[in-house]
């Protein structure tokens, strides 16, 4: 399946299929040099899938740490210095092969190297179906996640679904959070559909039918980012679950999707408090437990610590913390939330696990 962005200019294709890695070769001859930034996990398990690619002249492999630990100033400088030592030109390609963190990091390298070189995304996880599309790239700061970055469109996104076959269950859970988020954004019917399909851990772990929901998620994100590339309006909706989720992820060092799921429950609690929305919190908690999400850490949440991270969220303005909230299905808002409401919501969330 081939999708295409529909910006006024500078569009890029998104290939989503089994065996899609073959499309990388169609781009390599266009560049003076190419650097595959490949995460250590993918290199360990899939190195042979790239044999044909390394038969091309001037293609280099750069192995980087997997996950968020690659998104540091130190790794950024080390990678840039290595690439620059090859006397690169602007007709160079940075090719990100790995999960969402790899794409974020490699994209920031591409955006800043010589003030911008070519960039190809080759996502290898479910989570990266979200992050590889839309052009957000960046690294982390001691103050929080993704606070240093840019908007930088790739030349292409090549999503080979064969990579998903060997994902450990923890990564399936983490990736499913973004798939589920897209269903929530699409409304009550889409949410019921995905919940009925992925009823429990066994079905989710099998990945049966996941291709369809990934494709739908990408289409949902495309519709939003083409309408609002620089996140001035509706693109903020894609941050559903992320204001609280990023704080939990960064402080408790849990997988991104696990934290986003906690953030999704949290925003339902906040919406109930602000709008009397009557979301069934127990339903969502029980659903996540059926899927196998480890939620025990919720009892250890410390609001004051998390609130300091929430204050650094990129959606905020001078009025304070902004959250994406589902007032009702089909009615999504970006709302300022006061500290007391946020604190009470955190306390209420913890009561479900005592």
From Swiss-Prot:
Gene3D superfamilies: 3.40.50.1970, Dehydroquinate synthase-like - alpha domain (1.20.1090.10). Binds 1 divalent metal cation per subunit. Can use either Co(2+) or Zn(2+). Zn(2+) binds at residues 178, 242, 256. Pathway: Metabolic intermediate biosynthesis; chorismate biosynthesis; chorismate from D-erythrose 4-phosphate and phosphoenolpyruvate: step 2/7. InterPro entries: Dehydroquinate_synthase, DHQ_synth_AroB, DHQ_synth_fam, DHQS/DOIS_N, DHQS_C. The gene is aroB. The lineage of its organism: Bacteria, Bacillati, Bacillota, Bacilli, Bacillales. Its main location: cytoplasm. It comes from Staphylococcus aureus (strain bovine RF122 / ET3-1). Keywords: Amino-acid biosynthesis, Aromatic amino acid biosynthesis, Cobalt, Cytoplasm, Lyase, Metal-binding, NAD, Nucleotide-binding, Zinc. One of its GO terms (cellular component) is cytoplasm. It catalyses: 7-phospho-2-dehydro-3-deoxy-D-arabino-heptonate = 3-dehydroquinate + phosphate. One of its GO terms (molecular function) is nucleotide binding. It is an enzyme of class 4 (lyase). This is 3-dehydroquinate synthase. One of its GO terms (biological process) is chorismate biosynthetic process. NCBIfam families: aroB. Its cofactor is Co(2+); Zn(2+); NAD(+). Its EC number is 4.2.3.4. Catalyzes the conversion of 3-deoxy-D-arabino-heptulosonate 7-phosphate (DAHP) to dehydroquinate (DHQ). Belongs to the sugar phosphate cyclases superfamily. Dehydroquinate synthase family. NAD(+) binds at residues 100-104, 124-125, 136, 145, 163-166. It is found in: Cytoplasm.
């Amino acid at each position: 399946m081939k999708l295409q962005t529909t910006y006024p200019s500078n569009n890029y294709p998104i290939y989503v299929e089994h065996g899609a890695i073959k499309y990388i070769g169609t781009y390599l001859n266009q560049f003076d040099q190419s650097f595959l930034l490949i995460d250590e996990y993918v290199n360990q398990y899939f190195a042979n899938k790239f044999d044909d690619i390394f038969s091309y002249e001037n293609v280099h492999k750069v192995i980087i740490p997997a996950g968020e630990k690659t998104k540091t100033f130190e790794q950024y400088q080390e990678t840039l210095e290595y690439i620059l030592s090859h006397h690169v030109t602007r007709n160079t390609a940075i090719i990100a092969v790995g999960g969402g963190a790899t794409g974020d990091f490699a994209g920031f390298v591409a955006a800043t190297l010589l003030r911008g070189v070519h960039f190809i995304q080759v996502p290898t996880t479910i989570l990266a179906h979200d992050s590889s599309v839309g052009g957000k790239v960046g690294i982390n700061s001691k103050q929080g996640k993704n606070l240093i970055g840019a908007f930088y469109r790739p030349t292409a996104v090549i999503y080979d679904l064969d990579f998903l076959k060997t994902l450990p269950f923890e990564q399936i859970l983490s990736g499913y959070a973004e798939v589920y988020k897209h269903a929530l954004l699409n409304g009550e019917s889409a949410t019921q559909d995905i919940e009925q399909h992925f009823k429990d851990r066994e079905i989710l772990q099998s990945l049966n039918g996941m291709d369809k929901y990934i494709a739908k998620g990408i289409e949902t994100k495309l519709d939003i980012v083409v309408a609002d590339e620089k996140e001035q309006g509706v693109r903020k909706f894609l941050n559903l679950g992320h204001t609280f989720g990023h704080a939990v992820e960064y402080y408790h060092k849990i997988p991104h999707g696990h934290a986003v799921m906690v953030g999704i429950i949290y925003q339902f609690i906040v919406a109930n408090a602000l709008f009397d929305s009557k979301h069934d919190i127990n339903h969502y908690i029980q659903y996540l437990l059926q899927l196998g999400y480890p939620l025990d850490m919720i009892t250890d949440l410390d609001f004051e610590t998390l609130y300091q991270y929430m204050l650094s969220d990129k959606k905020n303005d001078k009025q304070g913390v902004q959250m994406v909230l589902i007032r009702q299905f089909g009615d999504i808002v970006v709302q300022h939330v006061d500290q007391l409401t946020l604190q009470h919501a955190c306390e209420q969330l913890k009561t479900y696990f005592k």
